[in-house]
């Protein structure tokens, strides 16, 4: 069960990263255990496996939106948003994760909903998400946005 959960979380992670250059991307709520996500981020920084201070602070980091910011930065090279949609370099992930992620994306099992463009503009006028990608703020974790006209 734990392995299945980590695979699903990895797949969710794939659809949670925004292209920081275009300030747009995909969002979803992190459900279940974030162990595998924390593992990927810490492994990416080549930290010793028995030393994961990042995981100890996981909840507070998630609360501050720092975790998503770090995750987006880590995976920026693997995922990008174009005017035609989202491009994922699957070489960075296991075939099992790829399969689940593709399935989730195609069948929309993540329960994602479009974010109204008015909401984006309102958040921008309030000073949110103007200087940093919306995904980095962690404030729109329940919504999905991928508007070609936004942030280009």
For each predicted feature, which ranges?
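Short, Lys/Arg-rich flexible segments
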Residues: 1-152
């Amino acid at each position: 069960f734990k392995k299945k959960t980590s695979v699903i979380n990895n797949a969710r992670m794939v659809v949670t990263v925004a292209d920081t250059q275009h300030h747009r991307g995909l969002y979803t709520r992190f459900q279940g255990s974030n162990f595998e996500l924390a593992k990927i981020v810490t492994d990416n920084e080549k930290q010793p496996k028995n030393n994961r201070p990042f995981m100890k602070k996981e909840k507070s980091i998630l609360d501050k939106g720092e975790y998503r910011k770090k995750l987006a930065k880590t995976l920026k090279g693997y995922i990008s948003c174009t005017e035609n949609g989202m491009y994922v370099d699957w070489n960075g992930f296991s075939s099992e994760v790829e399969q689940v992620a593709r399935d989730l994306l195609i069948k929309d099992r993540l329960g994602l909903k479009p974010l109204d463009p008015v909401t984006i503009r309102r958040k921008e006028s309030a000073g949110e998400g103007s200087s940093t990608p919306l995904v980095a703020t962690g404030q729109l974790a329940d919504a999905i946005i991928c508007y070609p006209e936004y942030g280009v």
